[in-house]
Amino acid sequence: EIQKVYGDDSVAAYFGETPQEERQKIVSTFQDKGSELRFFVGQPRTGGYGITLHAATTVIYYSNSFDLEIRLQSEDRAHRIGQENKVTYIDLVSPKTVDEKIIKALGKKSELAGKVLGENPRDWLV
């Protein structure tokens, strides 16, 4: 749908079926300041560890997981070394759906981690 509105040249898609040899090319193109890409669409688990998206200014969650660490890893991808932008995070959640329950559960998990591990629980997580 994004491609219909903004055109194919402005959207990069990166999913599980994306061939390994294309993945770094897609990420590098998105990171290039001269790139016409305005959107990077992917799934949190697809990139594996180490993917960097410091060109991002907005992260939109449209598919959520009960695993808090998967979400935090997604946020880290936009906050690696080289990030110069303020990053906004948006949850797309339909009322009375499982996503609404997932978001509530993530909030409770984050709150509990803060109580158990201290002010910055992420320092304890590996």
Briefly describe each language-model feature range.
Residues 1, 23-24, 38-86:
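SF2 helicase motor core recognition
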Residues 66-126:
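A conserved SF2-helicase RecA2
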Residues 14, 62, 92:
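Hydrophobic residues at beta-strand termini and immediately following loops
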Residues 30, 53, 106:
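Conserved RecA-like P-loop NTPase ATPase core
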Residues 6-47:
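Conserved helicase ATPase core of P-loop NTP-dependent helicases/translocases
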